[in-house]
Structures are given as structure tokens and as C-alpha cells.
Amino acid sequence: MSFNTFGHMFRVTTFGESHGVAIGCVVDGCPPLIPLTEADIQGDLDRRRPGQSRFTTQRQEADQVKILSGVMAHPETGVQVTTGTPIALLIENTDQRSKDYSEIQNKFRPGHADFTYEAKYGIRDYRGGGRSSARETATRVAAGAVARKVIAGMTVRGALVQIGPHQIDRDKWDWAEIGNNPFFCPDKDKAAFFADYLDGIRKSGSSIGAVIEVVAEGVPAGLGAPIYAKLDTDLAAALMSINAVKGVEIGDGFATAALTGEENADEMRMGNAGPQFLSNHAGGILGGISTGQPVVARFAVKPTSSILSPRKTIDRAGHDTDILTKGRHDPCVGIRAVPVGEAMVACVLADHLLRHRGQVG
């Protein structure tokens, strides 16, 4: 299996499977002399970690990260810093239940990558989905924590803005609320609604989709390049690569199709600090290059495909059959996708920042 690496200057390679011994990543291209400890990474991993509420999978993983290479104590200050060499990060798997999947090893789960992996490789890891499992995203979050250190001065924050057909009230958006509920929801009232709504979904054995919004502030103007290295191109690809993501938009995205030119174009004026935009329909990117405004991206996550109702499928021998998925699964995988989306945006920004420096100094 190839294509486990993304990025150009800031490159991330992930490895491991859901029920393997461990998962991890190698970050290559991180500049030297950046303070970095396991604690810097652990905080982000803890936000994504499973089993923290009744609304996520009850698989209990500590997700304790180990830095295997790429750092050392500074000879003068004693502070642990990056050396400029590849940074290897390891996260052990400790709560696998492969027996939960023994009955379906010869059946293709509807909505999962079982059939396509089998069609392409002639073999698949049926134990929790192997490499196609959302378990892999923990490695992205670890890499994203390193990226955040590279883009110091920029702030990347994510929020869950929709579950099923129910959207937040944007007039009530409060970033301070994100840590006060298990949904990463910036609307206090809607978070309470989500709890009741998702309880019903969970108890029925079903699942539901969601929309996540990621906002990057402090992004300087000039990141990205035309034509095939656009910042929004790489953001879309990075977010689309996350498990279960089925759609990505930048700025107003698909809503711009209903706008006129007068409504959509972000007008400008000169302010005391320089050029100012009067709106941000473009999501902080024009012509593939950052404008200096907040970069705004949203992505849609499909409902978790593993549900507790019988489904029609086929087996490896080509026979029609039914399947009932067991195991521990998220009723809304979009919840834990919030820190994953943040990580991917941070990695793309780190990559483009280094590419920008390499081109223009």
C-alpha cells in the first residue's frame, strides 16, 4: 500500500492499523530548535481520545504518545528541542477486541472500505477496519501538534456546527464553550439539544453525520501558489483524506452558487494597519493564496457505517447474505473529527509556510 505520506516540505507519513500493536507517524521537514515535548502532543491527543463520553466509542485507549527520535536537550538551555531530523511518534494500541469481528471476516460491511480494499489488494484487515479505521487519525493529531509548533503565531480551532439536519445558531457562537461540552460545540443551547438528540440516535443503535468548521487565524497573506499548489487545493485534499469525510468547502463554499457578484466579492478599504476586507466570503483565500484574513474550511462527515441493524451485503465467495455489525463504534464520528480537522489544517499551513519561506525568503 503506497500513498501514506502527505505534504511537501512538512511531510507526514502515518503507519499502523486499528488492531495492530501500535500506530504512529514520522514527521519530516520540521525545522530545528523548536521546543517539543510529549506533553505538547498529548494535549491534542487527549481531545480526540475515545471513550470520554457516552457519545463516542467506548473503546478505551490511553493514546499515550512516545517521541522516538528527532529531539534532544539543547546543550545550553537543557530545553528539549527539535533537531531537524525526522520525528518519529508512536502510540500503542491497548484495547483491541478482534473477536468482535470474527463473524464478519468473510463479509463486506456496507458503507465501509471492506469491498474496495479487497478489490484492490486481494486482502483486507477485517479487525476493526485495519488501516481504514478512524483509529489512524490519532497519528494525524500527533503530527498536527508538531505542526502547531511550526506555525506559532497562528491559531487553528475547530467546532462542530451541525449534527444531522440540526445546525448551531451562529449568533450564539462562543469559542469558550468548546471545552464545556462533549461535542466541541460553540453554541451552549445547541450543545444541550445535541445531547438529547444523539442519545436517541445512540439508543436506537443507529448513527448520524455532522459538519465541522475549522478556522485558522493569524495566517499571513501570501501562503499558497497558483496554479497547482493552491492553499485551498491542499486544504481540501487534506480534509477529504480524513475517514468518513464526504464533502469539503472553503469560505461560503456551495452557498456562493446562490449569491450575486455584488454579494460574494469581498470588498476592501485601507485601514490604519493596512488593507482591510469588509467581509470574508472567500474564507481567507483568493487565487489559491492566503489573504491575511481567517482561513475558514468546513467538512461533512457521513454517519458511522457500523450500526446495530441488520444490513444486506455479499460475502467474499460472492453470495448474498445479511450482516449485523458488532463492536464499539461512534454514534457520530464527526465529534472526534474536530481535532483531526484542526490537525490537518495545521499540517497544511506548516507545509505552505515552509514552502513560502523557501520561495520568497
From Swiss-Prot:
Signal peptide: none annotated. The keyword Lyase applies. InterPro entries: Chorismate_synth (IPR000453), Chorismate_synth_AroC_sf (IPR035904), Chorismate_synthase_CS (IPR020541). It catalyses: 5-O-(1-carboxyvinyl)-3-phosphoshikimate = chorismate + phosphate. NADP(+) binds at residues 48, 54. Pathway: Metabolic intermediate biosynthesis; chorismate biosynthesis; chorismate from D-erythrose 4-phosphate and phosphoenolpyruvate: step 7/7. SUPFAM superfamilies: Chorismate synthase, AroC. Keywords: Amino-acid biosynthesis, Aromatic amino acid biosynthesis, FAD, Flavoprotein, FMN, Lyase, NADP. Its EC number is 4.2.3.5. PROSITE patterns: CHORISMATE_SYNTHASE_1, CHORISMATE_SYNTHASE_2, CHORISMATE_SYNTHASE_3. GO terms for biological process: amino acid biosynthetic process; aromatic amino acid family biosynthetic process; chorismate biosynthetic process. Its cofactor is FMNH2. Reduced FMN (FMNH(2)). FMN binds at residues 131-133, 243-244, 287, 302-306, 328. Pfam families: Chorismate_synt. It comes from the Bacteria. GO terms for molecular function: chorismate synthase activity; FMN binding. Belongs to the chorismate synthase family. PANTHER family: CHORISMATE SYNTHASE (PTHR21085:SF0). This reaction introduces a second double bond into the aromatic ring system. Homotetramer. This is Chorismate synthase. It comes from Rhodopseudomonas palustris (strain HaA2). The lineage of its organism: Bacteria, Pseudomonadati, Pseudomonadota, Alphaproteobacteria, Hyphomicrobiales. The gene is aroC.
